[in-house]
Amino acid sequence: MLPLLRCVPRALGAAATGLRASIPAPPLRHLLQPAPRPCLRPFGLLSVRAGSARRSGLLQPPVPCACGCGALHTEGDKAFVEFLTDEIKEEKKIQKHKSLPKMSGDWELEVNGTEAKLLRKVAGEKITVTFNINNSIPPTFDGEEEPSQGQKAEEQEPELTSTPNFVVEVTKTDGKKTLVLDCHYPEDEIGHEDEAESDIFSIKEVSFQTTGDSEWRDTNYTLNTDSLDWALYDHLMDFLADRGVDNTFADELVELSTALEHQEYITFLEDLKSFVKSQ
């Protein structure tokens, strides 16, 4: 309520005070109700399905299958399959990359489901960057401006960008230890790539792990950069940049991750459609 009162111009003075006194305050329960969270993926066709004449059929109890296959067939499943068919068609229409984009800098790409690994060898060192696209799309901001009534539905939908955390491993030839740097994209830096001398990613943690170990040990010392001296932090960022992990790399990784996430999302919709449709 206070932010609304601060918006009243001082010039209104006592008139605004009288107006506030004449209007009853809303119940506290309404003020404490959480604001609705926006859907990350705008299912535009869902509202059409929900308001259709077939809605009443979805509430009917399932009837035995007439074909004798023993499977469950409902009007809800039929409507679900039709919705998924339309949704898959729309997602493929807006898909930017039919194949995954390539990274510059001689990086080799290995993909295993939602996990991707980039490998590069430079002067006796092996650099590995690993990331996972699950839960990599940040939530939309509530403060974004609402589209005007004249805008099309396609223009109203925000473009989804995948910004996953990624881990950089640097291993020396014949070395027993691997330097591990845990990196992420700060939310306040997303969308400000063009600002001079601004890093669009940051180092969160640094540690040493035994080369060849499949699992990292929690007993190894881990350096958190939140309380780190800025001079040491800058040297760590320069260390990564000298090995090809810089702002250009981070930009291309976002593009690669976004394409992979969208590809996996479409595959998930297709699998979901096949699962619901199967007899």
Curated annotation (Swiss-Prot):
Phosphoserine modification, residue list: S198, S202
Residue numbers of Phosphotyrosine PTMs: Y185
GO molecular function, one term: kininogen binding
Transit peptide, residue positions per record: 1-71
Annotated InterPro entries: MAM33, MAM33_sf
One GO biological process term: cytosolic ribosome assembly
Record note on quaternary structure: Homotrimer; three monomers form a donut-shaped structure with an unusually asymmetric charge distribution on the surface. Interacts with CDK13, HRK, VTN, NFYB, ADRA1B, FOXC1, DDX21, DDX50, NCL, SRSF1 and SRSF9. Interacts with CD93; the association may represent a cell surface C1q receptor. Interacts with KRT1; the association represents a cell surface kininogen receptor. Interacts with CD209; the interaction is indicative for a C1q:C1QBP:CD209 signaling complex. Interacts with FBL and RRP1; the respective interactions with C1QBP are competitive. Probably associates with the mitoribosome.
Family listed: Belongs to the MAM33 family.
Purpose: Multifunctional and multicompartmental protein involved in inflammation and infection processes, ribosome biogenesis, protein synthesis in mitochondria, regulation of apoptosis, transcriptional regulation and pre-mRNA splicing. At the cell surface is thought to act as an endothelial receptor for plasma proteins of the complement and kallikrein-kinin cascades. Putative receptor for C1q; specifically binds to the globular 'heads' of C1q thus inhibiting C1; may perform the receptor function through a complex with C1qR/CD93.
The protein's name: Complement component 1 Q subcomponent-binding protein, mitochondrial
